[in-house]
C-alpha cells in the first residue's frame, strides 16, 4: 500500500488551505544492478550493485493560498535507500569510481513562497522562492564508515511573460533561476544560475509561429561540486553547452477552427402539439 491523501478547505473565494501527503517507491534499473565494472576511461569506472534496495520517498506539505495568487507552503520529505550514482576516488588503484548505491537516508524540510499573478493584460509573473535544510547519510565504500552531510539551501525561479501589439501576436519571456550551494548525492554543489530570453511572433491568423532566443545568457549554468570527507578529497565540474541560441518555426496544418456541423431543423408538426 502506497497511500496518498489530501485535504482542502476554502472558507471563501480569497482563502484556501491545503494539506497533502504521499509515499512513492522507486526500483533500481537494470544498469544500476549490473555487477560488472565498465571502464569509462583509463582512470574512471562505472559500477553497479546487484544488492540495491528499492527507494522509498515520503512527502507531506501544508500551505495557504490568498486570492489564488500568493502561496506559502511548509514541507517535509524523507527518503530511505535513495538510488544514486556516487563518485568515489580509489586511492589504492588511482581510479575514479561511479558506483550505483543506496543513500541510507535523506531528509529535508523548509518553506516555499509562490506568486502567480497577472499584473496587467500584457504582463504575467510567476515567482518561486524555496528555503530548506537538508541532511544526507550514506556509507563510504572505501572505509565502510557512515558519512553525514548537512546543508541549508535556497533557490529562486522567476518567469516573466510579456505580450505586445493590440492582437498580442508578439510575446517575450524572461526566465531566471538561481540556486545556492546544495547537497546532491555524495557531493556539495556550488551556487549556480541561468537567465533565458525568448521572443515569439505569431502570423497567419496564429497558424504560423516563429521563436528565437538565448538560453543561459551569461553562461553561469556550469556546476562545480566538491567531495571532502574521510579519505575523499575531490572536485568535479559539469561543463555543458549551456549558452545556446535557439530558433523554431511552427505551422499548424489543417482547419484549426472546426465548427460543429450538427444541423438544427424546425419541425412544423411540433408546433401543433
Regions found by a protein language model. Give the residues of each.
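Outer-membrane beta-barrel signature, preferentially recognizing the C-terminal barrel domain
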Residues: 25-74, 78, 96-110, 116-118, ...
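Residues that define the transmembrane beta-barrel architecture of outer-membrane proteins
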Residues: 1, 56-60, 66, 105-109, ...
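Conserved C-terminal beta-signal and adjacent last beta-strands/turns
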Residues: 149-273
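Outer membrane beta-barrel strand-and-loop segments of large Gram-negative receptors
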Residues: 72-128, 137-157
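Outer-membrane beta-barrel strand-turn architecture
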Residues: 9-13, 56, 66-68, 78, ...
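Residues on the lipid-exposed face of transmembrane beta-strands in outer-membrane beta-barrel proteins
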Residues: 5-9, 60-66, 111-117, 131, ...
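Outer-membrane beta-barrel translocator domains and adjoining extracellular loop/strand segments
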Residues: 1, 30-37, 43-45, 77, ...
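Transmembrane beta-strands of outer-membrane beta-barrel pores
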Residues: 21-27, 37, 68, 76-80, ...
Amino acid at each position: 500500500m502506497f497511500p496518498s491523501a489530501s485535504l482542502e478547505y476554502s472558507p471563501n473565494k480569497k482563502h484556501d488551505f491545503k494539506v497533502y501527503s504521499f509515499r512513492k517507491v522507486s526500483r533500481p534499473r537494470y544498469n544500476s544492478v549490473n555487477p560488472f565494472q565498465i571502464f569509462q576511461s583509463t582512470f574512471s569506472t562505472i559500477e553497479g550493485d546487484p544488492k540495491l534496495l528499492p527507494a522509498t520517498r515520503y512527502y507531506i506539505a501544508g500551505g495557504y493560498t490568498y486570492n489564488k495568487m500568493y502561496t506559502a507552503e511548509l514541507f517535509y520529505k524523507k527518503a530511505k535507500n535513495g538510488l544514486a550514482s556516487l563518485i568515489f576516488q580509489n586511492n589504492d588503484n588511482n581510479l575514479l569510481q561511479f558506483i550505483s548505491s543506496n543513500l541510507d537516508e535523506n531528509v529535508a524540510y523548509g518553506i516555499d513562497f509562490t506568486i502567480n499573478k497577472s499584473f496587467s493584460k500584457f504582463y504575467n509573473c510567476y515567482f518561486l522562492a524555496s528555503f530548506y535544510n537538508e541532511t544526507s547519510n550514506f556509507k563510504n565504500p572505501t572505509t565502510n564508515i557512515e558519512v553525514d552531510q548537512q546543508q541549508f539551501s535556497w533557490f529562486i525561479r522567476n518567469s516573466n511573460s510579456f505580450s505586445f501589439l493590440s492582437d498580442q501576436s508578439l510575446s517575450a519571456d524572461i526566465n531566471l533561476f538561481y540556486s545556492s550551494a546544495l547537497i546532491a548525492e555524495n557531493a556539495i554543489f556550488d551556487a549556480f544560475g541561468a537567465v533565458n530570453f525568448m521572443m515569439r511572433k505569431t502570423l497567419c491568423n496564429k497558424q504560423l509561429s516563429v521563436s528565437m532566443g538565448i538560453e543561459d545568457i551569461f553562461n553561469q549554468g556550469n556546476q562545480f561540486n566538491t567531495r571532502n570527507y574521510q579519505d575523499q578529497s575531490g572536485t568535479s565540474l559539469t561543463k555543458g553547452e549551456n549558452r545556446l541560441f535557439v530558433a523554431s518555426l511552427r505551422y499548424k496544418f489543417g482547419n484549426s477552427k472546426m465548427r460543429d456541423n450538427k444541423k438544427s431543423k424546425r419541425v412544423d408538426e411540433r408546433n401543433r402539439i
